[in-house]
C-alpha cells in the first residue's frame, strides 16, 4: 500500500500536486516536497483554462481571497490579432455555442447570418463583453452566466456539468507561494535542499533522493516536477522524449513585465498577436501586463526577438529586464514509469498559444488520483494513465498546428514555412472535412483534451477556414427561430454591458 509520496521540484507544478494530494487523501498519505533554493522558476504571467476553477474549488479556496494575493485577473477568452490581415482579430471564448433546432449558431450564421457582423460577435456574448472590458461578475459577486451552478464544490474535469464562463490570469510565482502555504499548513513536509543523487533498487525503481543537507529522502511514489530537465523521468529512468519540432518549431520565448499606465485598460482576455517569426502573448495582471514573444530561432535570433518585443510593447523602456526561455516542445512517451510520475514541464509542454500549461498539470494530477496505486502497482492502471495523458497532449498539438495552417499570412519566411510544414494525420483529415461542413463531435479527436467542438469551429471560422456552402438541411428549415436567437444574443449583450462592472472595477473591489 502506498504510504508516502515524494515530490521533487516546487513551482506551480510541485505545489499544485502537493495541495491536490493533500486535499484528496488528507493524512492517509504522507507528502514531502523537495525543492532547491537555487532553481530559477520559469513562471511568468500565466493564463489558464476555465477548468482551473475546479482545481481551486476542490481545495476549498475562495476566489475572492486567493486571486488578489496572486495579482490575478479574469480571462473570458483569447483574442487573436493579425493572424490573417493586419488589424483583423477574433475571439476564442470559453462560452459554448447555443443550439437552435439541432444546429449550433455557427451553422445558422453561415446559412442566414448577417455577414457584416463577424462570426464571433454574432454567435457569442463574450465577444462584446471583451470589447467593453467587462468582468464576469456583478459587484455583489454574482456570476453573469446563470446556467452555471457554482455550488458543485469538489468537482473534477470529468464531472463538470457546464463550461465555466471564465478563467484567470495570475502571477505563477505568487500562485506557487500561496499553494505552498496551503499545503504546508495541511501537513506537507517541505525540504529546501539540492538533490545530488537519485537512488534506485535492483528493479530500477526509485528508492530515494539523496540531498546535500538532509540525506536520503525515501518514499513509495515519486513525482517529477523538475521542469524541462526531467531529473527523475528522463535522467534517472531514461524515459524517451518525443519532440514536436517537426510540426511546432517554436522553441524559445522572451518575456517582459510591463507596467500598465491606465488601470481601467485592464482587459478580461489574453491576446495572441502574430509577429514576424512567431506570436506574442499579452496577459493582463492586476497592475501590469505580462508580455512574451514565442518564436523559432531558425528564423530570428534571441537578440532580434527581444528588440521586436520591446519595440512593440515597451518602446524606450530599456530598464525592463527581459527573461529568455528555451523550451522543450513535446511529451514523454510515458509520463508514468515504474514508481515515478512526471507532472508539468517534465512530462509535456507545448507553446502556450491556448494556455494549456496549467491545464496539463491539473489533468495529470486528477488522473494520478484516479489511477492511484493500491496494494500493488497495477500495470493496467499505469498503462491507462499513460494512454490518457498521451492522447490529451497529442490532441492539443493537433489543435495548435491548426492555428498555423489556417493563418492567412505569408509575409515572412516564418509564415511561408508554416504553410509547407508537416501536419498530424488527424488534422489533415479535419481540414479536408472542413471544406464541406463545420466540424462536429464525430470528427473531433476522440479522447478528452480540453478543446471541444465549438473551439475547433471558432478557430476555423476565425482564421477563414469556411465551408464552401452551409449545411443543405438548413435551406429547408424555418430560419425564424435562429434569427430570433441572434437578436436575443445582441439584446443580452446590451443588458450585460450595462449591468456588469469593468474588469478593473470589480477586481479593485476585492483587493
UniProtKB/Swiss-Prot annotation:
Disruption phenotype: Mutant cannot produce pyrroindomycin B, but still produces pyrroindomycin A, the nonhalogenated derivative. The record marks 354 as: Important for activity. Chloride binds at residues 356-357. Pfam families: Trp_halogenase (PF04820). Keywords: Antibiotic biosynthesis, FAD, Flavoprotein, Nucleotide-binding, Oxidoreductase. Belongs to the flavin-dependent halogenase family. Bacterial tryptophan halogenase subfamily. The tryptophan-binding module binds the substrate in such a way as to expose the C5 position to the key lysine and glutamate residues at the site of chlorination. This is Tryptophan 5-halogenase PyrH. It comes from Streptomyces rugosporus.
Amino acid at each position: 500500500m502506498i504510504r508516502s509520496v515524494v515530490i521533487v521540484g516546487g513551482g506551480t507544478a510541485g505545489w499544485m500536486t502537493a495541495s491536490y494530494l493533500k486535499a484528496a487523501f488528507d493524512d492517509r498519505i504522507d507528502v514531502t516536497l523537495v525543492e532547491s533554493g537555487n532553481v530559477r522558476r520559469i513562471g511568468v504571467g500565466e493564463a489558464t483554462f476555465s477548468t482551473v476553477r475546479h482545481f481551486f474549488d476542490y481545495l476549498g479556496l475562495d476566489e475572492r481571497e486567493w486571486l488578489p494575493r496572486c495579482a490575478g485577473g479574469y480571462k473570458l477568452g483569447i483574442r487573436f490579432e493579425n493572424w490573417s490581415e493586419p488589424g483583423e482579430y477574433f475571439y476564442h471564448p470559453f462560452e459554448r455555442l447555443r443550439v437552435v433546432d439541432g444546429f449550433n449558431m455557427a451553422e445558422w450564421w453561415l446559412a442566414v447570418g448577417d455577414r457584416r457582423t463577424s462570426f464571433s460577435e454574432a454567435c457569442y456574448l463574450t465577444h462584446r463583453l471583451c470589447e467593453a472590458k467587462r468582468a464576469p461578475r456583478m459587484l455583489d459577486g454574482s456570476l453573469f452566466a446563470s446556467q452555471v451552478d457554482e455550488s458543485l464544490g469538489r468537482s473534477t474535469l470529468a464531472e463538470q456539468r457546464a463550461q465555466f464562463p471564465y478563467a484567470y490570469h495570475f502571477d505563477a510565482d505568487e500562485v506557487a507561494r500561496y499553494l505552498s502555504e496551503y499545503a504546508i499548513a495541511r501537513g506537507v513536509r517541505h525540504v529546501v535542499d539540492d538533490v545530488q543523487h537519485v537512488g534506485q533498487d535492483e528493479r530500477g525503481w526509485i528508492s530515494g533522493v539523496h540531498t546535500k543537507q538532509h540525506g536520503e529522502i525515501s518514499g513509495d511514489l515519486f513525482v517529477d516536477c523538475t521542469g524541462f530537465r526531467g531529473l527523475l523521468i528522463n535522467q534517472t529512468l531514461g524515459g524517451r522524449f518525443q519532440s514536436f519540432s517537426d510540426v511546432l518549431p517554436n522553441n524559445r520565448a522572451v518575456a517582459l513585465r510591463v507596467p500598465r499606465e491606465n488601470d481601467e485598460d485592464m482587459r478580461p482576455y489574453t491576446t495572441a498577436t502574430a509577429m514576424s517569426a512567431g506570436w506574442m502573448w499579452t496577459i493582463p495582471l492586476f497592475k501590469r501586463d505580462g508580455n512574451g514573444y514565442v518564436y523559432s530561432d531558425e528564423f530570428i535570433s534571441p537578440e532580434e526577438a527581444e528588440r521586436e518585443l520591446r519595440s512593440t510593447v515597451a518602446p524606450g523602456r530599456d530598464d525592463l529586464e527581459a527573461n529568455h526561455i528555451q523550451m522543450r516542445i513535446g511529451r514523454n512517451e510515458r509520463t508514468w514509469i515504474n514508481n515515478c510520475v512526471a507532472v508539468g514541464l517534465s512530462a509535456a509542454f507545448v507553446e502556450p498559444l491556448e494556455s494549456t500549461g496549467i491545464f496539463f498539470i491539473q489533468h495529470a494530477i486528477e488522473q494520478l488520483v484516479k489511477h492511484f496505486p493500491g496494494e500493488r502497482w497495477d500495470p493496467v492502471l499505469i498503462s491507462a494513465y499513460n494512454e490518457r495523458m498521451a492522447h490529451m497532449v497529442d490532441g492539443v498539438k493537433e489543435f495548435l498546428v491548426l492555428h498555423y495552417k489556417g493563418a492567412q499570412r505569408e509575409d515572412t519566411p516564418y509564415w511561408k514555412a508554416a504553410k509547407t510544414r508537416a501536419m498530424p494525420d488527424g488534422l489533415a483529415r479535419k481540414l479536408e472535412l472542413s471544406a464541406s461542413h463545420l466540424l462536429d463531435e464525430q470528427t473531433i479527436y476522440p479522447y478528452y483534451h480540453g478543446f471541444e467542438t465549438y473551439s475547433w469551429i471558432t478557430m476555423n471560422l476565425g482564421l477563414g477556414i469556411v465551408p464552401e456552402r452551409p449545411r443543405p438541411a438548413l435551406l429547408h428549415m424555418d430560419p425564424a427561430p435562429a434569427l430570433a436567437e441572434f437578436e436575443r444574443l445582441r439584446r443580452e449583450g446590451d443588458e450585460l454591458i450595462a449591468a456588469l462592472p469593468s474588469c478593473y472595477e470589480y477586481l479593485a473591489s476585492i483587493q
